[in-house]
Regions:
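Phosphate-ester processing/binding pockets and catalytic centers
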Residues: 1-344
């Protein structure tokens, strides 16, 4: 399906993700979440999948990004992302640095000011030890995670105990001043946890990057006023209620999303291409984040990352060609999910 300026037919972008660990942002398998989308006719996408198979010559029945990431298939990978490849100008990927996403969501919950997150995140290395920072992230993850296997106040008190310890240890530093601001949100934190324990958890989990990434994807493809539909690989968290929330939020924010449907990746070649791109982008972005990026491969990815990402690390952000922005999906004081804010 393509955009028709005469009759207003929607473009349909096929989507998939890589790096999802649900709400577990500190002890999962990956440090980056990537959400990729592809706009191609089904027939063309199927032809590209066949060509990838022919170039790789692997006996595998199902191809994943890992096949393309093997060094022996580097030429195929470079072709796929190149200007002359099948995805150039027809695909997009939204990147999320999980640690920054977590700090951003914590600042939004406690302060209604996600801008504080970027300042704290960028001061971390000059202030805290690696272990202290990991402990802070773990406490924040526990605070925001929607689960009811512990008393409402326990994650709150554990988080603020850690905040107080860091403030005392680094008194007088800019980071300590930022942490002081977090203490203003204790009542909000208690309300949030009490709502979860009382069966009033937010419809959209605060720590799951998928819903906001879908909205970002829709915003990208609906730029210029064209309507867009999304065909997404099946995900357990994309219930009918959450899909309705995504569609309603998009309408209220002026994003031209006309619908979101779930498909089986194995039956949609476009989604398979999106799966390739998501896995490739996640690996390249993680490599850059951890100081082991390949400049040539990162340069090939850069045209697909667009101008925004939920990304706090300055060096890797610049190399990936993304502009750091807050995630924009928050919760109210009682843990009720709010709409995407004005950054959209």
């Amino acid at each position: 399906m393509t955009w028709d300026h005469v009759n207003g037919t929607s473009v349909e972008a096929a989507c998939d993700e890589s790096g999802s660990d649900g709400e577990n942002l500190t002890r999962g398998n990956t440090d980056v979440f990537a959400h990729a989308s592809v706009v191609l006719p089904m027939e063309s996408a199927a032809g590209h999948i066949r060509e990838i198979r022919d170039r790789i010559r692997s006996p595998a029945e199902e191809y994943k990004a890992n096949h393309l990431l093997r060094e022996k298939h580097r030429a195929v990978l470079e072709w796929l992302l190149s200007v002359s490849g099948p995805l150039y100008g027809q695909a997009h990927v939204h990147l999320v640095e999980k640690a920054f996403f977590l700090v951003d969501r914590t600042a939004d919950l406690l302060l209604d000011d996600p801008g504080t997150a970027l300042s704290l995140y960028r001061s971390r290395r000059a202030t805290f030890s690696a272990e202290e920072w990991r402990e802070f992230l773990t406490a924040a993850n526990r605070l925001l995670w929607i689960r009811v296997d512990e008393a409402a106040g326990e994650p709150v008190e554990a988080f603020f105990h850690h905040i107080d310890r860091l403030r005392r240890a680094y008194s007088g530093t800019p980071a300590a001043d930022l942490l002081e601001r977090f203490t203003q949100g204790r009542e909000r934190a208690h309300s949030y946890r009490a709502a979860i324990l009382g069966g009033r958890a937010p419809l959209i989990p605060v720590l799951n990057p998928l819903p906001s990434s879908i909205l970002r994807t829709a915003a990208h493809w609906s730029g210029g006023g064209r309507p867009v539909r999304l065909a997404h690989d099946r995900q357990n968290m994309l219930t009918p209620e959450r899909i309705a929330w995504i569609e309603d939020t998009a309408r209220r924010r002026g994003i031209g999303l006309t619908g979101l449907r779930l498909v089986v990746a194995g039956s949609d070649a476009r989604v398979q291409l999106a799966d390739f791109l998501a896995g490739i982008a996640r690996r390249f972005a993680s490599d850059e984040l951890n100081g082991r990026g390949d400049p040539a491969l990162t340069a090939l990815l850069r045209p697909y990352t667009g101008e925004s990402a939920v990304w706090g690390d300055e060096g890797s952000r610049a190399r990936l060609g993304a502009v750091a922005e807050p995630d924009n999906v928050g919760t109210g004081p009682a843990g009720c999910s709010t709409e995407v804010n004005s950054a959209f």
